[in-house]
Amino acid sequence: TFNMVKHSVEQMVLNRYGRIVLCASSSGLGSSGQANYAAAKEGIVGFSRSLASELLEYGISVNSVYPGGATRMTASIPQTTRDLRKAMDSKKKGTDTQEMPSSDEPPEASNPENNAPKMVYLCTEPAGEITGQVFGTFGWNMSLYSPRHVTHSINKVGNWSVEELSNILPISLAKELTNPMPKQE
């Protein structure tokens, strides 16, 4: 991904125009048995967001896509892993980092070719103002993922001690957090 961008962006900067769409994966949001893949794919999102801010002044938009579909790679996931993921997902509480939105779409909707028009659109003139975003393109759906941002913070003058944090975090920053994988009893 880096090398492709490195070699193409030089001409885009000279032209003061360009569109870059990078393929990430919703696995980057957390997927059992794929920590290495998840880290690499979510790294693409960080790369994309950084590029978007760096290249904005040159008229270059940069976005990431979580493409989906039934592929040889998804077909190669062992049934035991699928069962484990399903069991883990059913135990998760308060998270919205699941796969793309479910629908009642027919099997042909999961053809990866359905990603193409959505990705091509991001390269068009009307999409030029869209930059630094992450889109999901599974099936016939298209989703916009929210950017990460600070939701809560705590402050004090000076450094925190572990004891202070132990007292304040449970009633402040961690107050509404739920463990997505609670201990089995």
Model-identified regions with their sequence ranges:
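ATP-dependent carboxylate/acyl-activation modules
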Residues: N3, R16, L55, M142, ...
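Catalytic loop of short-chain dehydrogenase/reductase
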Residues: V13-L14, R19-G43, S48-R49, S53-E57, ...
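Hydrophobic positions on the long internal alpha-helix
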Residues: N3-S8, F47-S48, K118-L122
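C-terminal helical subdomain
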Residues: K86-E185
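Proline-glycine-enriched beta-turn/loop adjacent to the NAD(P) cofactor-binding site
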Residues: N63-T71, Q133, F138-W140
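Short, small/polar-rich loop/turn modules that mediate ligand/substrate recognition or access, typified
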Residues: L56, S61, I130-G132
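Generic structural signal for alpha-helix termini and adjacent loop/cap motifs
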Residues: H7, N15, T124-A127
